[in-house]
UniProtKB/Swiss-Prot annotation:
Organism encoding this protein: Gallus gallus (Chicken)
Protein name: Vacuolar protein sorting-associated protein 53 homolog
Family affiliation: Belongs to the VPS53 family.
Keyword tags: Coiled coil, Endosome, Golgi apparatus, Membrane, Protein transport, Transport
Biased composition (Polar residues): 800-815
Region annotation Disordered: where it falls in the sequence: 370-391, 794-819
Stored Pfam families: VPS53_C (PF16854), Vps53_N (PF04100)
Gene Ontology BP annotations: endocytic recycling; protein transport; retrograde transport, endosome to Golgi
InterPro entries: Vps53 (IPR039766), Vps53_C (IPR031745), Vps53_C_sf (IPR038260), Vps53_N (IPR007234)
Domain of life of the source: Eukaryota
Length: 831
């Protein structure tokens, strides 16, 4: 029985558990503070709240009665709600029927209202029918009166127009004709009426007669053949121009064409192709002539033509078109006589004249012209050629002093740019050839100056400075580019770029690479073999202080040239036409300067490396098995440190402006010296325990010196670059591990082999063989050791074999020879 009650209670509890969302909705709709309504109601806690102490149990009967009373009230409420829901369905159906009846009544009322509205509308139409007829009659009457007035005005105007035309009263005709034309527009829809059509035809006839009459008057006043009529313009012609404004635009264009043609007829005679003044050396006279003609026109005919005709500008523009055609014709005929100075003189005078036109005229008559307005290049923050606009209005001459002229404010766009000077573009090859010749002479002068003046003097403040010749070269490049961009931004700019590329390569070869100190006495030029390869036991001459400074100076110059060449490429792309941008590419030239930088660094590395070779050779020839005690660092270490302290501060001070390349020098020296040091370590055999300890001490000393290499001998101590530190630590730690393996006892063999694999992580049997030779083991012992070593080697990962050996061991002579051949081919390809 008790079990059934427990199951029932558990079922009730489970049934009362509601979802959190449902519980939250109930609490929102029926908020309650009663603990019994809480979702997390706990009966034990509730009872403990009612009876907190044993004494409170005395009131248990009272509490039970209250709860029973509350239960009875809840039961009554539940019964009331249940009874209330008994008739809900019937009440709902009744309410729905009542709603449907109400809707039907509403539809009936709406229909009645609609019928009444239609009847009201019909009644209003009947009432206003007569009023609408009156409105239409009034509107038609007004239109008829207006039309009759217009007809009267048109008829009278046509009669007056014909009479005034016969009497050439152009002043009155100008105003009357415009009015007649405006009135005639009102009769466009009545052209089917014969009388209206007749009036329209009379107006057209009057217009045609006026046009022919005005053209005849201008032909009489300004005949196409013969000289201009003396005296100023008549008032009749001035009024005729006002009439022409109202007539067909072709009349106006014909008047303008005849007048300009007659006005420039003298120019065509004076500057015929066979005349002496027609050649480029007297091009000033052409522009002086048109200036006089424009002044003469303003004085005599300025008031004759309406201001909106812009006759002065039209005369100037037509002069430009004629001049461009005539100059192009004569230059084709006498192309062999064109010299660069003459061409630049003519272009400079022409561009000055075009600038004068831009100041005087707006260019409004060029809307349908043949000259395309040039697009302004986008603004640039590039420091290269930042003051290039300063030479735009100056005379174009090929002198270095032009680069020092003060910067002028940027001039606005010139709508007349190229209107005449376009004819010179096909002949700009003369200018390009001249620049080719000038640059060739400039490079030869740089070579001669370097030979005469010699390398820069060794000075801490000046050593490693950029050679002055490279600044002169780029200043000249700047002036050439500005000149050419003023002349043309098309194919001539591409041709000039090709010239720039040619002499950048020549500068890199003749001035930079050609003056690098040679490492051999052979008469051949600098080769990569002489930079990288040395014969065993040969004596390599050490560079002097002057030669070290020269190498650093060439390196700094190459870096400057590389950066400036990149800026030059960007500026050329800004100047050239958008369709030609892809043809500007100076990557090959920047690569050339990069090779010069690499060669310079390699020379510095080789010099210091070669200086350390005798010390390393001495180390390998010492009798290390006879060393009896460990002392201070060995003499060969002192010698290496001495060479480093002599060379590195000089190189660092001379490369102060190019810190990244000094870092490259340090990295390349470490990559060269450390493998060579390890190779010489392997030559030290046999080695006693004490000898190995001395070598370990020496190796640690060299490691400390190499770590301090970037700031050695400097008053300002800087932290070495992390990339350099990693190389030194990795390489010299390998040397220390080799010596520690040599110091370890070879008995038992298994422990020795495992210790070797653990310390060196080198799976190469050649390296292990060298370690055994350093320990002085006999061949029989070495054979067993090698066999054990092969057995104890860990299995390499798939696809990888001897990775540790490849990454840690020094390159073999065959590998080095292959690298040298590849590098030689690369340099030949670039240079």
């Amino acid at each position: 029985m008790e079990e059934d009650e427990l199951e029932l209670a558990a079922g009730l509890e489970a049934a009362l558990e509601l979802a959190p969302a449902v519980q939250a909705a109930i609490e929102q709709v029926f908020p309650s503070q009663d603990p019994l309504d809480r979702a997390d109601f706990n009966a034990v806690e509730y009872i403990n709240t009612l009876f907190p102490t044993e004494q409170s149990l005395a009131n248990i009967d009272e509490v039970v009665n209250k709860i029973r009373l509350k239960i009875r009230k809840l039961d009554d409420n539940i019964r009331t709600v249940v009874r209330g829901q008994t008739n809900v369905g019937q009440d709902g159906r009744q309410a729905l029927e009542e709603a449907q009846k109400a809707i039907q009544q509403l539809f009936g009322k709406i229909k009645d209202i609609k019928d009444k509205a239609e009847k009201s509308e019909q009644m209003v139409k009947e009432i206003t029918r007569d009023i609408k007829q009156l409105d239409h009659a009034k509107r038609h009457l007004t239109t008829s009166i207006t039309t009759l007035n217009h007809l009267h005005m048109l008829a009278g105007g046509v009669d007056s127009l014909e009479a005034m035309t016969r009497r050439r009263q152009y002043g009155e005709v100008a105003n009357l004709l415009q009015g007649v034309v405006n009135v005639l527009e009102h009769f466009n829809k009545y052209m089917g009426i014969p009388q209206i059509r007749q009036l329209s035809e009379r107006v057209k006839a009057a217009q045609n007669e006026l046009g022919q009459q005005i053209l005849a008057d201008f032909e009489e006043a300004f005949p196409s053949q013969g000289t201009k009529r003396p005296g100023g313009p008549s008032n009749v012609l001035r009024d005729a121009c006002l009439v022409a404004n109202v007539l067909d635009p072709r009349i106006k264009q014909e008047i303008i064409k005849k007048f300009i043609k007659q006005h420039l007829s003298e120019y065509l005679v004076l500057f015929q192709e066979n005349q002496d003044v027609a050649w480029l050396d007297k091009i000033d006279r052409r522009y002086a002539w048109i200036k006089r003609q424009l002044v003469d026109y303003e004085e005599k005919y300025g008031r004759m033509f309406p201001q909106e005709w812009c006759m002065t500008e039209r005369i100037a523009v037509e002069f430009c078109h004629v001049t461009r055609t005539e100059l192009a014709k004569i230059m084709r005929t006498r192309a062999k006589e064109i010299e660069v100075k003459l061409l630049l003189f003519a272009i400079q005078r022409t561009t000055n004249f075009e600038g004068l036109l831009a100041k005087r005229f707006s260019g409004c008559t060029l809307a349908d012209g043949t000259v395309k307005k040039p697009e302004a290049p986008p603004p640039s923050t590039n420091p290269f050629l930042e003051d290039e606009t300063g030479t735009e209005t100056d005379e174009i001459v090929i002198e270095k002093s032009d680069a020092d002229k003060p910067k002028k404010p940027k001039v606005p766009d010139n709508p007349f740019h190229g209107i005449v000077s376009k004819c010179f573009e096909p002949h700009l090859y003369v200018y390009i050839e001249s620049q080719d010749k000038n640059l060739s002479e400039l490079i030869d002068r740089f070579v001669a100056d370097f030979k005469a003046q010699g390398p820069p003097k060794p000075n801490v403040d000046e050593g490693g400075a950029v050679l002055p010749s490279c600044a002169d070269l780029f200043v000249y490049y700047k002036k050439c580019m500005v000149q050419c961009s003023q002349l043309s931004t098309g194919e001539p700019m591409i041709a000039l770029t090709t010239i720039f590329q040619k002499y950048l390569r020549e500068y890199a070869w003749k001035i930079l690479s050609g003056n690098l100190p040679k490492t051999t006495s052979s008469s051949g030029g600098l080769t990569i073999t002489s930079l990288l390869k040395e014969k065993e036991g040969s004596e390599v001459a050490k560079f002097t202080l002057e030669e070290l400074c020269l190498i650093c100076s060439i390196l700094s110059t190459a870096e400057y040239c590389l950066a400036t060449t990149q800026q030059l490429e960007e500026k050329l792309k800004e100047k050239v036409d958008a369709s030609l941008v892809e043809r500007i590419n100076l990557t090959g030239e920047t690569d050339t300067f990069s090779i010069v930088i690499s060669n310079s660094i390699q020379l510095l590395v080789q010099d210091l490396d070669a200086a350390c070779d005798p010390a390393l050779t001495a180390m390998s020839k010492m009798q290390w098995q006879n060393v009896e005690h460990v002392g201070d660092q060995s003499p060969y270490v002192t010698s290496v440190i001495l060479h480093i302290k002599q060379n590195v501060p000089i190189i660092r001070d001379n490369l102060a402006s190019t810190r990244k390349y000094f870092t490259q020098f340090c990295i390349k020296f470490a990559n060269s010296f450390i493998p060579k040091f390890i190779n010489h370590l392997f030559k030290c055999k046999p080695i006693s325990m004490v000898g190995a300890e001395q070598l370990l001490l020496d190796t640690h000393s060299l490691k400390m010196v190499l770590l301090d290499l970037p700031s050695i001998g400097s008053q300002v101590v800087r932290k070495a670059p992390a990339s350099y530190t990693r190389i030194v630590v990795k390489g010299m730690t390998r040397a220390e591990m080799i010596l520690k393996v040599v110091m370890a006892p070879h008995e038992p063999p298994v422990v020795f082999v495992d210790n070797y694999i653990k310390l060196l992580a080198d799976c190469s049997t050649d390296t292990f063989q060298k370690i055994l030779d350093m320990k002085g083991l006999k061949r029989s012992e070495q054979s067993s050791m090698l066999e054990l070593f092969r057995q104890r080697l860990p299995a390499p990962p798939s696809g990888v074999e001897n990775s540790g050996s490849l990454s840690l061991s020094a390159p073999t002579p065959e590998q080095e020879s292959s690298r040298i051949r590849k590098l030689e081919k690369l340099i030949k390809k670039r240079l």
